[in-house]
């Protein structure tokens, strides 16, 4: 029997690894939700309703974490005792720092020129960058290179943040 303290992977009876089959995760989530959804306990006592609500909340949190590759990687590292350190560890390899500066300059230039096409192109480039970095992250996690994976997570967080900024710039320029 799974307890509230078990891992997200245990909750859905999935192996604790980065590569997940999304349809399998979705089916496991629906199976758990069908068992613990508060509507099933509408006629139950207050204690049972409260427990059902805890389980439903736990299932939702676990599902949201596992379906997002970046959150899943961070969670896997947490299970391994590795803190990604996104708040206080901003150390990045020099090549990535140079890439960051280039992206920032391109965003600034395109936004200054009100060039939505250039921003769209950069956003597409960052999507490709994200895909490649997720593949690298998976390989690092699979090989047990947890510190390398933690740095890859921090880099991906930056890529996602910049992508969101570009999306916001495009939105502003189009309206």
Curated annotation (Swiss-Prot):
Keywords: Chaperone
A cellular component annotation (GO) from this entry: iron-sulfur cluster transfer complex
Pfam families: HSCB_C (PF07743)
SUPFAM superfamilies linked to this entry: Chaperone J-domain, HSC20 (HSCB), C-terminal oligomerisation domain
SMART domains in the record: DnaJ
Transmembrane spans: none
All copies of domain J, residue ranges: 7-79
GO terms under biological process: [2Fe-2S] cluster assembly; protein complex oligomerization; protein folding
Family, per entry: Belongs to the HscB family.
NCBIfam families, alphabetized: hscB, PRK03578.1
Protein name, UniProt field: Co-chaperone protein HscB homolog
Gene: hscB
């Amino acid at each position: 029997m799974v307890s509230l303290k078990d891992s997200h992977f245990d909750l859905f009876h999935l192996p604790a690894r980065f590569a997940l089959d999304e349809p399998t995760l979705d089916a496991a989530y629906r199976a758990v939700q069908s068992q613990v959804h508060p509507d099933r306990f509408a006629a139950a006592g207050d204690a049972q309703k409260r427990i059902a609500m805890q389980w439903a909340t736990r299932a939702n949190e676990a599902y949201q974490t596992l379906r997002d590759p970046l959150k899943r990687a961070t969670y896997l590292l947490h299970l391994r005792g590795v803190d990604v350190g996104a708040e206080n560890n901003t150390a990045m390899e020099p090549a990535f720092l140079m890439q960051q500066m280039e992206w920032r300059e391109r965003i600034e230039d395109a936004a200054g020129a009100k060039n939505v096409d250039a921003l769209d192109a950069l956003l597409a480039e960052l999507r490709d960058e994200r895909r490649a970095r997720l593949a690298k992250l998976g390989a690092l996690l699979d090989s047990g290179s947890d510190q390398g994976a933690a740095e890859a997570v921090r880099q991906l967080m930056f890529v996602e943040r910049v992508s969101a900024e570009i999306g916001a710039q495009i939105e502003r320029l189009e309206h």
